[in-house]
């Protein structure tokens, strides 16, 4: 197989309802800018996340909207972390 092949950095950040998640989004945006890298913000729906309070659910939604506003591709993946592993090779 002939090369050279295009290569580059990509950043993946997994978000939750934690109040500090918005800070993590901003940090990831700065890192992506420094690396000139595309970035993806994900949340994984599990049995635990389906039991979040309305306030926690709203906070997670706000954090995902912030990531999108700052240039991230955003994904909500139903299921367990194992599904994430099937997604990452294509990123």
Per-segment meaning from a language model:
Residues 1-2, 73-91:
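Structural beta-alpha unit
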Residues 4-68, 75-76:
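Small/aliphatic-rich secondary-structure junction motif
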